[in-house]
């Protein structure tokens, strides 16, 4: 893990959609995965206020590992217990590229839920979205986010999720996650194995 910043963890949570919303599948075709996103609540002085994100947060002294950080934060933010799912492993650690953002190192964990319990968002979460992975991999999801600061424009790659754009560090995590799926599958259902770090 890179050094020089505080540590944090997020959970990229996948599920097979419930039968009521899953597209029809043949006898040998599994329904495609959906990926969970949250829209963070508007909080003054929070650099990620109102952003689209994965559930997660900063590592606390009582957390035995970053996997436990992801578990605790997801439970606090959404009432979702990741121990009810299967941890595939961790993606590469990431840090913000902007010098204006806090120095923090984020480890993303990939979890597949074997059921779809209802989400109970806390005050930190304004909205939740389950987005089909197949759509995220299609051209219709590709977008550009424009940031205007001091009379200048910066253009960032982004993904459309509902009426919102996923950009910044979450976009970088998502791009890394999507590379795990077999590019030849028309409906991505089987991500490749990841380095495993067990949940507590």
Q: Where do the model's predicted regions map?
A:
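N-terminal leader/linker segments that precede catalytic domains of diphosphate-processing enzymes
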Residues: 1-54, 58-117, 134, 147-200
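Acidic, glycine-rich loop-and-strand cores that form catalytic or ligand-binding grooves
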Residues: 118-135
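A mid-sequence, solvent-exposed acidic-amphipathic segment
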Residues: 135-144
